[in-house]
């Protein structure tokens, strides 16, 4: 489906962007989040220049994204390591089971 125009209000300014209908709710939520961040930043920093606030917010969001990407990479690496360890454990168990079942007189059912 094609993108549709969506009107947003961010920090007292109107903005019209095109957005696929299935992403409209996520876009509105992102706009609300950005608006809240800008309001909070204005109160915390006492900066009144809107452009400066937007740049600070963008840097904060970029930093958070970088941190989340690092967490995801670390988690994926940890999972890969665990999978390799499980695979080795299973392979070792299968080898040992093969050795046991090859001994005369041992039967497993």
UniProtKB/Swiss-Prot annotation:
<dbReference type="InterPro" id="IPR023771">
    <property type="entry name" value="Cell_div_ZapA_eubact"/>
</dbReference>
<dbReference type="InterPro" id="IPR007838">
    <property type="entry name" value="Cell_div_ZapA-like"/>
</dbReference>
<dbReference type="GO" id="GO:0005886">
    <property type="term" value="C:plasma membrane"/>
</dbReference>
<dbReference type="GO" id="GO:0000921">
    <property type="term" value="P:septin ring assembly"/>
</dbReference>
<keyword id="KW-0717">Septation</keyword>
<dbReference type="GO" id="GO:0030428">
    <property type="term" value="C:cell septum"/>
</dbReference>
<dbReference type="GO" id="GO:0032153">
    <property type="term" value="C:cell division site"/>
</dbReference>
<keyword id="KW-0131">Cell cycle</keyword>
<comment type="function">
    <text>Activator of cell division through the inhibition of FtsZ GTPase activity, therefore promoting FtsZ assembly into bundles of protofilaments necessary for the formation of the division Z ring. It is recruited early at mid-cell but it is not essential for cell division.</text>
</comment>
<dbReference type="InterPro" id="IPR042233">
    <property type="entry name" value="Cell_div_ZapA_N"/>
</dbReference>
<protein>
    <recommendedName>
        <fullName>Cell division protein ZapA</fullName>
    </recommendedName>
</protein>
<comment type="similarity">
    <text>Belongs to the ZapA family. Type 1 subfamily.</text>
</comment>
<dbReference type="GO" id="GO:0043093">
    <property type="term" value="P:FtsZ-dependent cytokinesis"/>
</dbReference>
<dbReference type="GO" id="GO:0005829">
    <property type="term" value="C:cytosol"/>
</dbReference>
<dbReference type="InterPro" id="IPR036192">
    <property type="entry name" value="Cell_div_ZapA-like_sf"/>
</dbReference>
<feature type="coiled-coil region">
    <location>
        <begin position="21"/>
        <end position="99"/>
    </location>
</feature>
<dbReference type="Pfam" id="PF05164">
    <property type="entry name" value="ZapA"/>
</dbReference>
<keyword id="KW-0132">Cell division</keyword>
<keyword id="KW-0175">Coiled coil</keyword>
<comment type="subunit">
    <text>Homodimer. Interacts with FtsZ.</text>
</comment>
<dbReference type="GO" id="GO:0000917">
    <property type="term" value="P:division septum assembly"/>
</dbReference>
<keyword id="KW-0963">Cytoplasm</keyword>
């Amino acid at each position: 489906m094609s993108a549709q125009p969506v009107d947003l209000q961010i920090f007292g300014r109107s903005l019209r962007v095109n957005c696929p209908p299935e992403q409209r709710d996520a876009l509105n939520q992102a706009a609300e989040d950005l608006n809240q961040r800008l309001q909070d930043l204005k109160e915390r920093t006492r900066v009144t220049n809107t452009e400066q606030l937007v740049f600070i917010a963008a840097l904060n969001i970029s930093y958070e994204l970088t941190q989340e990407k690092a967490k995801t990479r670390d988690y994926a690496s940890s999972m890969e390591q665990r999978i390799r360890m499980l695979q080795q454990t299973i392979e070792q168990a299968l080898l040992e089971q093969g050795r046991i079942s090859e001994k005369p007189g041992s039967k497993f059912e």
